[in-house]
């Protein structure tokens, strides 16, 4: 596992965007051989999306031959609702870059057959071979996507019940009214994430410090689903300074030394 210790959320966003752009450009995608990118929503990736849009407008990257799969979507929320992940992704990213509409894959939380929707999503991912880079965030309780504590580490795309804590955390997007936050969501599974060639998790804020500690210094434990990344051959944690407050000093010093050359120029 790599840990990229930065100072601010803005630096995390810039580093992550630069990494994505470098991966896409090195891959040299074509219509027949697209780069497959997994994407999250929420507050954490906002600076990354902003930086990606800026880099696209500067001519540093094209998304014409990029295929995307989003991590999750609320169940029962109309896709036109401003807080649906369909709306979020178009508002903050898709509408500002040159990605073709047919290359965008989002779970349908209003599908008449939820099990079939989840199964078809997995099948479509497999049809591309694999996701080359999956970017994500992490919840205060260590959940990735909507794989809440005690999720199976072999799980696939499915419907999940959201914990009260997750709904409270997300209520900031719903006028701070937890009753407006859906109780269920469709989410890729832990196993789906582990199938990706590379997984990059962004970690921001002191409230995520225990989750980061569990991921880096703890044992693999389904109560902290983020810890599954210890099993992944190519996992990256990109974090700001407040999120590292629970790590041991020697742990942080170790990663600072390892990544010194990779965190310059931000």
From Swiss-Prot:
Spell out the activity regulation: Allosterically activated by N-acetylglucosamine 6-phosphate (GlcNAc6P).
Looking up Pfam families in the UniProt record yields: Glucosamine_iso
Cited PROSITE patterns: GLC_GALNAC_ISOMERASE
Top-level division of the source organism's lineage:
Bacteria
Pathway connected to this protein? Amino-sugar metabolism; N-acetylneuraminate degradation; D-fructose 6-phosphate from N-acetylneuraminate: step 5/5
Which transformation does this protein catalyse, written as a reaction? alpha-D-glucosamine 6-phosphate + H2O = beta-D-fructose 6-phosphate + NH4(+)
Which EC numbers characterise this protein's activity in its record?
3.5.99.6
Q: Which residue positions are annotated as catalytic? A: 72 (proton acceptor), 141 (for ring-opening step), 143 (proton acceptor), 148 (for ring-opening step)
BP term (GO), one: carbohydrate metabolic process
Quote the cellular component terms of the Gene Ontology held in the record: cytosol
Give the record's family classification: Belongs to the glucosamine/galactosamine-6-phosphate isomerase family. NagB subfamily.
Assembly information from the UniProt record: Homohexamer; trimer of disulfide-linked dimers.
Looking up PANTHER family in the UniProt record yields: GLUCOSAMINE-6-PHOSPHATE ISOMERASE
Please give the name of this protein: Glucosamine-6-phosphate deaminase
GN (gene name) = nagB
């Amino acid at each position: 596992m790599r840990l990229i210790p930065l100072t601010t959320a803005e630096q995390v966003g810039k580093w992550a965007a630069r990494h994505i752009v470098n991966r896409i450009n090195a891959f040299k995608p074509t219509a027949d051989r697209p780069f497959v990118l997994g994407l999250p929503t929420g507050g954490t990736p906002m600076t990354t999306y902003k930086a990606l849009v800026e880099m696209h407008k500067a001519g540093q990257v094209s998304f014409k031959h990029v295929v995307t799969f989003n991590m999750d979507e609320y169940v029962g929320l109309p896709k036109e609702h401003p807080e649906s992940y369909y709306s979020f992704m178009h508002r903050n990213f898709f509408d500002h870059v040159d990605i073709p509409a047919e290359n965008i894959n989002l779970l349908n939380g209003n599908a008449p057959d939820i099990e079939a929707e989840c199964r078809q999503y997995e099948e479509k991912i497999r049809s591309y071979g694999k996701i080359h880079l999956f970017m994500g965030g992490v919840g205060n309780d260590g959940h990735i996507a909507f794989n809440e504590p005690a999720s199976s580490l072999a799980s696939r795309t499915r419907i999940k019940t959201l914990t009260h804590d997750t709904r409270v955390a997300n209520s900031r997007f719903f006028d701070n009214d937890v009753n407006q936050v859906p109780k269920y969501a469709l989410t890729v599974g832990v196993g789906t994430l582990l199938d990706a060639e590379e997984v990059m998790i962004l970690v921001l804020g002191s409230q995520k410090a225990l989750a980061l500690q569990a991921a880096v210094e703890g044992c693999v434990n389904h109560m902290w689903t983020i810890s599954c990344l210890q099993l992944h051959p190519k996992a990256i944690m990109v974090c700001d300074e407040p999120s590292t407050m629970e790590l041991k000093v020697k742990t942080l010093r170790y990663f600072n030394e390892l990544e010194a050359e990779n965190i310059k120029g931000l």
